[in-house]
Design a protein with these regions (language model features):
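Conserved mid-core segment of classical short-chain dehydrogenase/reductases
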Residues: 83-101, 124-130, 151-154, 194
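Residue(s) in the substrate-gating loop at a strand-loop-helix junction
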Residues: 142
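Short, small/polar-rich loop/turn modules that mediate ligand/substrate recognition or access, typified
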Residues: 174, 179, 233-236
């Protein structure tokens, strides 16, 4: 797909990997719209829309605004998500069911909610001239989908759901010439990790097989761009983790 003047939607684009992705795609010539729940987010994107991905009405309204003000996206990168750690049974007793539901609602249901609305909008586009496709959807999972740690039952379940729906979504949306892929990052130097003490960061980096460091948000963004460009990548879950296997 040719990047120039194509519209790219990034959810969770106000910070972390989403922000890096938005900046990178904009530098490559795309017109970027960010959907994020943060009201006061600072963004250089062409369009910013406040959106709660867990609410169908919020997502549908955000899409209407996007189409009216910029056009229909050909690219969607779902980065919106949360990663709270909570044990099934902790010092205060059983994990509140509401805590589990919240993670599923934001990470899994939120991703699906955006995907369904975006796919419907993309299905009405003309085929892109060079690639003969209508669009590309890239979802964000995590290596926790495969090797979740203590306290990550909810998070791992939410990201595992994203992994599991990648292939069926790709198969179903193929009729509209829309590709669906998922990236499963490992330890990335997002604000969450960078706010930890340096010794903790160093300890985490040492667990990566090679290179012995935290991943960079820009490396996630670069992989997103490659997935957009490579027309044969479809229905795939790609680990971006330096061969890290969590124990």
């Amino acid at each position: 797909m040719n990047f120039t003047n194509q519209i790219a939607l990034i959810t969770g684009g106000a910070s972390g990997m989403g922000k890096a992705c938005a900046q990178y795609l904009q530098q490559r010539g795309m017109r970027v719209v960010i959907w994020d729940k943060q009201e006061d987010a600072q963004s250089d994107a062409e369009l910013f829309i406040q959106c709660d991905v867990t609410q169908d009405e919020s997502v549908e309204q955000a899409m209407q605004q996007t189409i009216a003000r910029l056009g229909t996206p050909r690219v969607c990168v779902n980065c919106a998500g949360i990663a709270p750690a909570k044990r099934i049974v902790g010092k205060e007793g059983a994990m509140p069911l509401a805590a589990f539901k919240q993670v599923i609602e934001v990470n899994l249901i939120g991703t699906f909610n955006v995907m369904r609305v975006v796919a419907h909008a993309m299905s009405g586009l003309e085929l892109e001239r060079t690639s003969q496709e209508r669009g590309v959807i890239i979802n964000t999972a995590s290596i926790a989908a495969f090797e979740g740690q203590i306290g990550q039952a909810a998070y791992s379940a939410s990201k595992g759901g994203i992994v599991s729906m990648t292939l069926p979504a790709a198969r179903e949306l193929a009729q509209f010439a829309i590709r669906v892929n998922t990236i499963a990052p490992g330890l990335i130097a997002t604000p969450l990790l960078l706010n930890m003490p340096q010794e903790v960061q160093d300890s985490l980096a040492a667990t990566v097989t090679f290179p012995k460091r935290l991943g960079r948000p820009e490396e996630f963004a670069s992989l997103v761009a490659h997935v957009i460009e490579n027309e044969m990548l479809n229905g795939e879950v790609i680990r971006l983790d330096g061969a890290l296997r969590m124990r």
